[in-house]
Every structure is written in C-alpha cells, then in structure tokens.
C-alpha cells in the first residue's frame, strides 16, 4: 500500500512539473504595421475601419444641420423633449460652435480625414504580394482611401467653407485654409484617384468600396456647387463629368426601370447604385432611430412599430395660417 502511495505521489509530481510552462506575458509597447499586417484579413480589417466611419458620418447630425437651417424644415416641441433648445437654435440661426450637432459634424469630418490618411500611409508600406495579393490591388486601396479623404473634405467644405488641409497623418495643427484652397485640394485628390480606381462591370455587386464612378460623381458634386463655395461657375465641367458617367466612361451604370431597383433589400445588385453600405439588418432596425426623427410623436402607435419610441419629428414648416390663409413670409414656406 505504501509503495502504491509513493508511485501515485511520484506520478502527480511528474504531471505537475511537466505541466508547468512559462506563463510570463510578453508585453508590447505598441502595435506596428510590422506586427499587425500578417494576412489578407488583417489588411482588409484595417482598410474598412475608415469606411465604417464613413457609414457613421451619415447620421442625424448631418441631416438636421442641412434641413433645420433652411427655413423649410423644423422640429417643434411635442411632449417633454426639447433637447436644450438645440432645434430652436438651428431654426433661428443662433447656434454656437459647441452646438451638439455642429460639434459632432466638425469632429466627424476631421476624424474621417485623419483615419483615411493614417490608413493610407500604413498600408503603403505593406508587402501585398507576400500576403497573397497584388500590387494592383494595393494601388486601388491607396486611391480608395485618397477618395475618402476627398469625400470628407468635400463635406467639410459644404458645411464650413475653408478647412484645415492635411496632406499626411500628423498631430500638428495646421491653420484653416480658404474655401478656394479646400476646393482645389478636393479636386486635386479626385482627379488623381479616378483613373487609378477600378471600373465597375455589369457583373459586379456594390459592396461599399469605391470605384471610378463614385469618385467621378463626387467630382461632379464639387463642380456643381463651385459658385456657392467660391463664386466661380463650373457648371460646364459638372455637365461633362455627368455625361461621361452616362456614357460609361467610368464604368457600368444605368437608371433602373422602377423605384425598387435602388431601394430594395438586394440593392447591391442595382445598376443605379454607385456607393452603398452593407447591412444585415434587413428589417431596417439599424437606422430605426433615424426613421423616428421624421415621424409624428405618436406614429409608432399608428403604424404599430414595436421597439420604436416617440420623438419630436422633423417636419415642413407651415405655409398656411391656422385659418387656412397663406403666410406672406418670403422664406420658410415650402409651398
């Protein structure tokens, strides 16, 4: 019996000693491109982060700044929610730089530029071939990120006029440029990117990435608003880019036969859609809070929308007085 006990003790000692490994952690002070980019998957996970910010940027802050400052739309008080008079400030044009919707939009533009520039610089040093990809794909990724930089500067130009122009990723502050300088920078980025981006073919799906046609459409937007941005008429250039799009110069695009083409749940197959965001939320729950913003306070009850809440919905400003007579104001009358 004693011999058996000794054998068991010896066996357990051997088991414990063989199971002891060095569990000391190896600490890294930082994650660098050399340690992170080890596969095709890590490259794409890094690339799409700039695109997820682009998706976030299409939020209510941007919509309300564009609509509630136009004298056509407003958010009136229904119920207890007034949100610290933020909607009234937009209505009467007396907002401050720290107005929540304004602050988030300024931050969103800068964050988008910073992300895209940093991603472009880090991916420029990655050996795509060693990870099973091509140099052509690398060049395409570089131009997609450059187009994202142009997109965010275009949005900043539209909201604020001249923006601080960054050409590389840096923590140093740069002074604010003029609207014309910002316009020229956006144009420069897009003109350089368009010929190097991939063209859409008829068999391609829209999966959120950037192609020639999308960058060309952004350039057309830039030219269309040039007179407002900097007092220069660029309608001829805008018309030419649009005609080139219709003629297929920048890839395969066609107008759909009916409304459901670009707005159905499988619109990634649409011939008309040029840039879209992938979503698995087929019931629209991903953006339900945005839908609430455009409905009446009790719309959820009328439509039996489970999970929706009551919100002060944005609506057209009234064009008629309570007695039915039209208002005489020159602004603020949608019809």
Q: What kind of feature is each model-predicted range?
A:
Residues 1-4:
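Positively charged n-region of N-terminal signal peptides that target proteins for export
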Residues 157-158, 164, 201, 225-231:
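Short coil/turn linking the two alpha-helices of tandem helical-hairpin repeats
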Residues 17-19:
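C-terminal motif of bacterial Sec signal peptides marking the signal peptidase cleavage site
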Residues 41-57, 80-160, 173-184, 190-204:
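Conserved, well-structured interaction surfaces
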Residues 167-170:
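Outer-membrane beta-barrel translocator domains and adjoining extracellular loop/strand segments
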Residues 21-83, 191-194, 209-335:
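An aromatic- and glycine-enriched ligand-binding surface/loop that stacks and positions planar moieties
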Residues 172-173, 229:
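Short strand->helix junction
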Residues 10-14:
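Hydrophobic helical h-region of N-terminal Sec-dependent signal peptides
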